[in-house]
Amino acid sequence: MSKTYLTEKKFSDFALHPKVIEALEKKGFSNCTQIQALTLPITVKGHDIAGQAQTGTGKTLAFLTSTFHYLLTHPAKEGHEKNQPRALIMAPTRELAVQIYTDAQPLAQSTGVKMGLAYGGDGYDEQLKVLNNGVDIVIGTTGRLIDYVKQGHINLNAIQVVVLDEADRMYDLGFIKDIRWLFRRMPNAAERMNMLFSATLSYRVRELAFEQMNNPEYVEVEPEQKTGFSIKEELFYPSNEEKMRLLQTLIEEEWPERCIIFANTKHRCDDIWAHLAADGHRVGLLTGDVPQKKRLRILEDFTQGNIDILVATDVAARGLHIPSVTHVFNYDLPDDCEDYVHRIGRTGRAGKSGNSISLACEEYALNLPAIETYIQHAIPVSKYNSDALLTDLPEPKRRHRPRQGQPRRNNSAPRRGNNTQRNNRNKRPSHS
C-alpha cells in the first residue's frame, strides 16, 4: 500500500451527480483517499460494498458521497410518505452520529436533501419535530431508531440506502440484535444499496454482510503496520507511584497543541482530569456519565481549540473526526489490543504526523505482549529519570472546579513556558 494519503483519482473522475461534485469542490475536496477511490466505482453503479480502512482515511465521506449520489439519481419509491426516510445511516455512538450529520451538512446544503438525527440521551422532542416534517436521510443510533419505529414516527418500508458505520464497534457494544431488528423492517437487500464500513472486517462482520447485504464487494485498505506510518510511538515503564507525575512531566515537555489522554476507567479519567485542571491546563472530560449536551459541548470546545487536552475513556476512541490531534497518551494500556490501534488512530490523521505515548504501569503492563503481537511490532521504549519528574504540583481539584476550558496557567503561560524551576530540569526521558 502506498504511504501517500491522497490518490491521483479525483472525485470528478466518477460519474457523480453534479450537485455532489459542487458540494465537494466548495469544501476543497478534489482528490480521493484510497478508501474513497475504491468505494466510488462500486457505489456509483448502485452495488453493495463492505469496506475496511484504517481510522481517519475518509470512510465517512466515502459513504456520504455515495448516499447523496444515489438519492439524487434514483426516484423515491412510489407512494413514499412523510415518515418514510429514503436512507438510514446507523452509528454505534451518539457522538459519531452527530459527527456524521455535521460532515454531511455541505452535501445537504448543495443538494437540498433533508436530514434528521435520532440518538438517545436527550433531544427527543427536538429530533422528533425534524423527523415529523419529513426527511430523506436519518442518521442515528439503534436504540432511538427502534423507539421511533415502534411508535410509528419512522417507517422503514421505503428505505433505498443503508449504511452501517463502525460495524465491529456495533458488535462490541452489543447492538447486533438491534441492527437485525431494524433490517427486518426494511425492503429486502436486493431492493436497496447497502454499505458497511469497519476498521476491521472480522468473521462476524463478514457474516453480517452476508446476511443483510446483496452480494457485496469487499474492499480493504490495510496499512503494512496497523498503527500507521505517520504515528511516532513511545513507551515508558513507570511505577504506579510515579505514573501521574510522569504524565504531567511529559505534557510540560511536549506541550501538545491538542491531545487526548485515554484511561481504562471513569474513575481514573476523573483523577487525571482533576490533576491537570488543578495544574491550570485547559482540559475536558469525556466519560459515559457526562450528560450528552455537555459531551457535545466539550467535543466542540476541543475541536475549536478552546480545550487543549481531552481525558477520555474509549467512548471517544472510535469514529470521531477531531482534526489536528498532535498527541495521544495511553495513561492505561487498553485491555483490548484493537483499542490500542483505535486510540492512537486519533492522531496522525489525514496524512499528518502524530505522537503516541503509552505508560505501561504495574497494573496494565501485562496487556503489552498482546498489543505488540496485534500491531506486529515492538513499541520503542524510553527511559526516564525519577529525579527529573515534576514535584511542585498542586493537589487535584474537585471535578466541578475549575470550569471546563480554564486557560492554562491562568492564561499567563507562554506555549513553551518560562518557569525557570521546571525548565532547568532535564525533564525529557532519555531514549534507550
UniProtKB/Swiss-Prot annotation:
Helicase C-terminal domain span: 245-390
Domain Helicase ATP-binding: 40-219
Skewed-composition ranges (Low complexity): 404-423
Localisation: Cytoplasm
Region (Disordered): 393-432
Family that this chain belongs to: Belongs to the DEAD box helicase family. RhlB subfamily.
Protein name according to UniProt: ATP-dependent RNA helicase RhlB
Organism: Proteus mirabilis (strain HI4320)
Gene this chain is encoded by: rhlB
